[in-house]
């Protein structure tokens, strides 16, 4: 089943239907990129509920392309907690367990932090890996970033009123005072987010409704998620009905049934 063409805001009746359409869209984007001039697909993932959502639906959605296609995928992470990979808070660790065991992406194509390094060094090391893997642009360009948004409006590990929102030189930044535990993390910065070819924000549940109204309807442009405005790429929001319940702005209602 083909995913719906994304509008600015797409609303689904349940997280399950959202996840199925998201997986189809990732697979379609991958196929398009692999047929393009660069012949590769660079995907940036966020953690949280996205892990289980993608683990459930992406392997089947991407399977028709065949195992060989995954050798040309490059997978990165939009932010990461500075914890060992077997820690429950490790975003890579969760994807390794639940998704990467089902997708034959070579380990060399999965870009991770080195959690044994101090946070500043871990950020620099991850930035080097990104530049090496995504060569050809002054700022590394992902073909697709999948982002979440917190009830406070944060995305990645970019939090409201934090100095990292002003970072323009680094492509990956360390953070040692995260308002959410664990405190030490590394995160992509706004210049990298806004260089992406496509960005999908995913939000589900009533707990996200108020902040989505602030971003999408009240246009509170200082919230971190609102600062994600791709320079030339596409931006869309995938929401379930609970997350969208306070919105009166136009959106497209989708169903995979």
Swiss-Prot record:
Entry superkingdom: Eukaryota
InterPro entries for the chain: 6-phosphogluconolactonase_DevB (IPR005900), Glc/Gal-6P_isomerase (IPR006148), NagB/RpiA_transferase-like (IPR037171), PGLS (IPR039104)
Residues recorded with modification Phosphoserine: 49
GO molecular function list: 6-phosphogluconolactonase activity
Positions of post-translational N-acetylalanine modification: 2
A single BP term in Gene Ontology: pentose-phosphate shunt, oxidative branch
Predominant subcellular localization, coarse grouping: cytoplasm
Known EC number: 3.1.1.31
Catalytic activity: 6-phospho-D-glucono-1,5-lactone + H2O = 6-phospho-D-gluconate + H(+)
Subcellular location per the Swiss-Prot or TrEMBL entry: Cytoplasm
Pathway field: Carbohydrate degradation; pentose phosphate pathway; D-ribulose 5-phosphate from D-glucose 6-phosphate (oxidative stage): step 2/3
Listed GO CC annotations: cytoplasm
Family according to the record: Belongs to the glucosamine/galactosamine-6-phosphate isomerase family. 6-phosphogluconolactonase subfamily.
PANTHER family to which the protein is assigned, alphabetical: 6-PHOSPHOGLUCONOLACTONASE
Function, in words: Hydrolysis of 6-phosphogluconolactone to 6-phosphogluconate.
Protein name in the entry: 6-phosphogluconolactonase
Gene from which this protein is expressed: Pgls
């Amino acid at each position: 089943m083909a995913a719906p063409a994304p509008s600015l805001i797409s609303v689904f009746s349940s997280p399950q239907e959202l996840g199925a359409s998201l997986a189809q869209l990732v697979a379609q984007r991958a196929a398009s990129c692999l047929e393009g001039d660069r012949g590769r697909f660079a995907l940036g993932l966020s953690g949280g509920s996205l892990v289980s959502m993608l683990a459930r639906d992406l392997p089947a959605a991407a399977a028709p392309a065949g195992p060989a296609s995954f050798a040309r995928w490059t997978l990165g992470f939009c932010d990461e907690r500075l914890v060992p990979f077997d820690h429950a808070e490790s975003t890579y660790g969760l994807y390794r367990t639940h998704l990467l065991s089902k997708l034959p992406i070579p380990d060399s194509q999965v870009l991770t932090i080195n959690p044994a390094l101090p946070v500043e060094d871990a950020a620099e090391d991850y930035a080097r890996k990104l530049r090496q893997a995504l060569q050809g642009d002054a700022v590394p360009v992902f073909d697709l970033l999948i982002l979440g948004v917190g009830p406070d409006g944060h995305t990645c590990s970019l939090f409201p009123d934090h100095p990292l929102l002003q970072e323009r030189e680094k492509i990956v930044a360390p953070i040692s005072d995260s308002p959410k535990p664990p405190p030490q993390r590394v995160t992509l910065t706004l210049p990298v987010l806004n260089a992406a070819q496509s960005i999908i924000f995913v939000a589900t549940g009533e707990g996200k409704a108020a902040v989505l109204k602030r971003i999408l309807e009240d246009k509170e442009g200082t919230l971190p998620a609102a600062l994600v405005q791709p320079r030339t790429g596409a931006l869309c929001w995938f929401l379930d009905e609970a997350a969208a319940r306070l919105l009166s702005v136009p959106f497209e209602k989708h169903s995979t049934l």
